[in-house]
């Protein structure tokens, strides 16, 4: 599988300079998907979640960053992929948050999962693809994916 190389990006300071960190992505792909497909999917998720604004705080303060990551989601991802490291607050950094999302989905998505299944897991948790309430979310992500064609 080819590697996706992205430049190093410094996260914006959140409350104080101690939150300023850098992350380098050397490899980023969802299991069974190419890196280009993964990149497009992540862009669609980010657009739906936050309008691609990485500094958003939502869900009454429970979700942060462009992917609207909850602390429990982040913890599941870093427990699965210990190379992620960092702090929850690093989810304001797009590249870091992408690693978190990929790890979470690789942890919980069944082998060969469709884009729909992946989007619904992101939105509704490990069994989110079985929850009727995540169907509307998938339709939004699907529209974003279609714009990229």
Regions found by a protein language model. Give the residues of each.
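Short, flexible active-site loops
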Residues: 28, 51, 84-85
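Short linear motifs at secondary-structure transitions and domain/linker junctions
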Residues: 21, 41-46, 96-98
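Short, solvent-exposed loop/turn elements at domain surfaces
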Residues: 53-57, 76-79
